[in-house]
Amino acid sequence: MDAGERIRELADRIVELRTAYYEGAPLVADAEYDAVEDELRALIAAHPELAPDPNPLDQVGAPAVLHAPVRHSRPMLSLEKATTPEQVAAFFERFPGQPVVVMPKLDGLSLALVYEDGRLVRAVTRGDGTTGDDVTMLVRALVDGVPEQIDVPGRVEVRGEAVMLRSTFLAYNAAHPDKPLINPRNAAAGTLRAKDPATVAERRLRFFGFDLDTAEGGAAADLGEGLRALGIAGAAMRMCADAEQAQAAITDIERGRNDLDYDIDGAVLRLADRDAYAAAGTRSNSPRGALAFKFAAEEKTTVLEAVTWDVGKTGKIVPVARLEPVFVGGTTVTKATLANQQVIRARDIKVGDTVLVRRAGDVIPFVAGVLDASKRTGAEVEIVPPTECPSCGQPVTEQGNSRELFCTNASCPAQTVRRLIHWASRAAADIDAIGGVWIERLAEAGILENPSDFYTLTKERLLEFDRIGEVSATRMIESIDRSRDVGLRRALIGLAIPMASEGTAARLARAGFASLEEVADAGEERLVAVEDIGPKVAASLVEHLTRLRPELERLRERGVSLDVREEDLPPVVAAGAPLAGKTVVVTGAISDPRSGEKVARPTFQRLCEKAGATAASSVSANTDLLITGAGVGESKLAKAEKLGVEIVDQATIWAQLIEAKLV
């Protein structure tokens, strides 16, 4: 696999992992996610001309989907990461003489509280960093530590973290052994996604502030003092004058993490003076005046009691460790990931071993290795990978350098359920009213087997099931009906074709294919002609779309659109387009000069396309213009200069767009 293909694969993987994480169902440990990001970052540094566009490393947060969307007054950004004392020292060197507060990095759900003339008027989740969800009703009902009124006039915005305390989490699970919560972080996120506060009334959350924005003179310049004056608690803050003091504070926080009543996954360093913090400004996706120091993963020892093998939507079979219960990072862990058989062999892990369980980033536990192989008793048992699929009994195959196992039986029951869940996911058909548990039950009952079967469901059929009432059944059917307008791009995502990523689907939608059937008929030669689609991806598309042709026909018969949607097409070029015939590359953070608001790079690229340009992801000899925003990378500038590419500031392009009445 060449560098370009690997970069595209990693970029698509990051999008997939982020979506799962923010849906409350993370697929990998934080450490594994960080490794994917780090590999992509290193490849882009080595091959800046191959940087993906949009670049997921320039984006923050989760897609906002619940409740009414609200645009933030200023972006809620992620924090730059640090893991070494040298990085802490470098942070202090950037701001000589400025005091810094160090506080625990809480592991919950970020919120923005907006007060106007002393009254709470809105509570909004971080969402995608630019737009979040209005959860005011839920916050008022369920979140402690949020005053309804404050003694400050004008507009005040307090940002912070809503967490479920460990004591609340343990008490809830003790009272609900049949439906325990997974961990406090997921519980906090799930609570504020509830449709009705009454359904989650026992799940109390607690708010801790970490940011404050007021009119001039509206609060103390010192962050901690400003929050306290409003009656809002902040996570314990320590004022530090230099890097040595800050590192000592970080060490103290890490040592005391198990004594806290809330989960943390690091420490935050931030300029103590609010004016200095604001003056420091931002990068494309993080504030300059703050830093997140990530702790090493928490580890505990326990006994590996058994290994089971789970089957995914593409037939991939992965080992899952079943563990003697152990308390790690604020939750009791009974299972963990083992990745694949190569990892098992490399770490020489056996059933019966005392193993190290690591909860990286305090999210997904995994087996890091054997504590001491020399102390084995001889009763330990080798972990033998299956030769048959644990779901359907068909022979398995090995693929790739990691010798990953796959079931190739398209009718495998486990794959069927996973594929149905994937079709209903947000990235695909977005059938949000039917969760995975109900999809599994409907599949077990023989009602659902293929995506097209969703569109034969009736309210009367759903009401035959226990625990589905009139309201739930109506919501399910309405959700299914809304999904009929899925279109080419999202339908292709939903069909879970191996090697065909979300990026593949987007490129096909923009390449002139009118429908999914036309893609199926295209043949490998035409597919390879599409930008960034290689022979392996083309072969996979041909093979699987040929197999799925009867399913495409059933979807059509049941009123599902497989045609390309207007939103996925290249934009119509305006008459007298100022950038006609130009190939452009956009780099850096883009902001609308009329409002000062940040503009997503894909949005700006689409505006350039309306102005007649062809947007490319990397600088080459064919590039006409490199359009630069804030924080532009030196590597792209150097390459553009070397190739003789004209470099223009975004302000010049904005002026042309405004004059052409394209914005």
Swiss-Prot record:
Cofactor needs: Mg(2+); Mn(2+)
Presence of the UniProt keyword Lipid biosynthesis in the record: no
Residues binding NAD(+): D30, A31, E32, Y33, D34, S78, L79, R126, E161, K294
GO terms for biological process, alphabetical: DNA repair; DNA replication
Reactions catalysed according to its record: NAD(+) + (deoxyribonucleotide)n-3'-hydroxyl + 5'-phospho-(deoxyribonucleotide)m = (deoxyribonucleotide)n+m + AMP + beta-nicotinamide D-nucleotide
Keywords of the record: DNA damage, DNA repair, DNA replication, Ligase, Magnesium, Manganese, Metal-binding, NAD, Zinc
Pfam families membership: DNA_ligase_aden (PF01653), DNA_ligase_OB (PF03120), HHH_2 (PF12826)
EC number: 6.5.1.2
Molecular-function GO term, any one: DNA ligase (NAD+) activity
Binding site for Zn(2+): C389, C392, C407, C412
Domain BRCT as annotated: residue spans: 574-663
Active site: K105 (n6-amp-lysine intermediate)
Alphabetized InterPro entries for the sequence: BRCT_dom, BRCT_dom_sf, DisA/LigA_HHH, DNA_ligase, DNA_ligase_AS, DNAligase_adenylation, DNAligase_N, Hlx-hairpin-Hlx_DNA-bd_motif
Lineage: superkingdom: Bacteria
Family per similarity comment: Belongs to the NAD-dependent DNA ligase family. LigA subfamily.
Protein's job: DNA ligase that catalyzes the formation of phosphodiester linkages between 5'-phosphoryl and 3'-hydroxyl groups in double-stranded DNA using NAD as a coenzyme and as the energy source for the reaction. It is essential for DNA replication and repair of damaged DNA.
Record's protein name: DNA ligase 1
Gene from which this protein is expressed: ligA1
